[in-house]
Amino acid sequence: MATPDVSVHMEEVVVVTTPDTAVDGSGVEEVKTVLVTTNLAPHGGDLTEDNMETENAAAAAAAAFTASSQLKEAVLVKMAEEGENLEAEIVYPITCGDSRANLIWRKFVCPGINVKCVQYDEHVISPKEFVHLAGKSTLKDWKRAIRMNGIMLRKIMDSGELDFYQHDKVCSNTCRSTKIDLSGARVSLSSPTSTEYIPLTPAAADVNGSPATITIETCEDPGDWTTTIGDDTFAFWRGLKDAGLLDEVIQEFQQELEETMKGLQQRVQDPPLQLRDAVLLNNIVQNFGMLDLVKKVLASHKCQMDRSREQYARDLAALEQQCDEHRRRAKELKHKSQHLSNVLMTLTPVPLPSPMKRPRLARATSGPAAMASQVLTQSAQIALSPGMPVSQLTSVPLGKVVSTLPSTVLGKGSPQAAPASSPASPLLGGYTVLASSGSTFPNAVEIHPDTSSLTVLSTAAMQDGSTVLKVVSPLQLLTLPGLGPTLQNVAQASPAGSTIVTMPTATATGPEEHTATIEVAAVAEDHEQK
């Protein structure tokens, strides 16, 4: 069913000023109400006045007029006198469901949806709030929900008879034409300006044999996307489908959209975002109702970020728990270490004083001068009885001088030291062995092993007057043949650091062997050298 165009022609507005006198004589504000009618049809009759009511000084006097056979519109003009100047305010009575209000045209500026321009019960609200208060919030297009004399506000504005106040000067660039151009003109999606209305030719507008005005329902904001269209719009698209042109139109749409989106995708890679790209995105979202897709992407990203934040929080809590466990473990180990240290301190014995070190043996240098000096520094000699067992030699301290003298010399009570040049006084390992001043080793030496710790290794030294016997602790008898009077500085310490005692031996000349017992004449203090 085709809907005919609405042609409205505004006639001359007549303003009549009549003074009003109060009954009680008090001065009140003069309110003048002038009824201005417009003829909506070429064959209009006289206007019939239904009713007229007077409101207070803040609101204009409203009067509703109806015509039975012809469409008429009542316009209320409120004239308020401020001093000597007169100010006219034009209001339009509007309805939404069962609710009634007045549209203040001077405040009805672009885009209008959220502008407070509707006077409802002495309150000025926005058209969107008026639709919600009327219980028509399910209608997403507020221009369809609001009517003037039973005609949708959208149809009146599409016809051009009503527009926003000073729209040519004040425009938000969010308003768009609701007409479709079927004569070949193209409108770019990136154009920020509104499209102009181009009238349809009869050939282009002829759908199913009847001329009609084709309108495309659009939205003022993303929330005004509508799923309902008029019968004429549906008939137009069905005619394109029947003519086999709908596929071609869709392909053109797809190609245009692909090129536009491809260029947009290339441009958004380089920051910052350009203004024209932002306008293009806004138009795409508004025209195609893709605000829900944007919200879906944001909600998905927010959900992902929330999951990541929760995972990071759990990982951080686990790491903090591990750190606390390591700190507690370290504290326990430190406490145990301190306890063990205290126990060890109580169990540690008092250190005993280190034993006195045994004096080192003084090594005399070889040569007659050294031996003479060693002999002359003798002091504190200790006389021993003749025939002392060899086992008692182990108790002789270090640094002593042991001399073997004949019994005739011992009887005199004073030992005679051999001259330094005599071969009978060799220096052996820190011990000086002194012999009598007689012949070289005149007496043979006989060792009696009277203890189990003394071992006689050889008795061949009895035949050689130049053999030297050494007593080493544990007591062992060693023979060193062939040394004779040239023996010097022969000393050897045992692994245990025992005392080394050396004694010269000699054998008597003659066919018979003569033996003699070692007689230790004296032990003299030796000068300690370090």
From Swiss-Prot:
> Could you tell me which Pfam families the record lists for this protein?
SAND (PF01342)
Binding positions for DNA? K136, K140, K143, R154
One term of GO molecular function: metal ion binding
Q: Where does Zn(2+) bind?
A: C110, H167, C171, C175
**Location of cross-link Glycyl lysine isopeptide (Lys-Gly) (interchain with G-Cter in SUMO2):** K155
Q: Any idea where the SAND domain is?
A: 81-163
What is one term from the GO cellular component aspect held by the record? nucleoplasm
According to the lineage, what is the superkingdom?
A: Eukaryota
Q: What subcellular compartments does it reside in?
A: Nucleus; Cytoplasm
- Oligomeric state and partners? Homodimer, and heterodimer of GMEB1 and GMEB2. Interacts with the glucocorticoid receptor (NR3C1). May interact with CREB-binding protein (CBP).
Name used for this protein in its record: Glucocorticoid modulatory element-binding protein 2
This chain's source organism reads Mus musculus (Mouse)
Organism lineage reads as:
Eukaryota, Metazoa, Chordata, Craniata, Vertebrata
Name the gene behind this protein.
Gmeb2
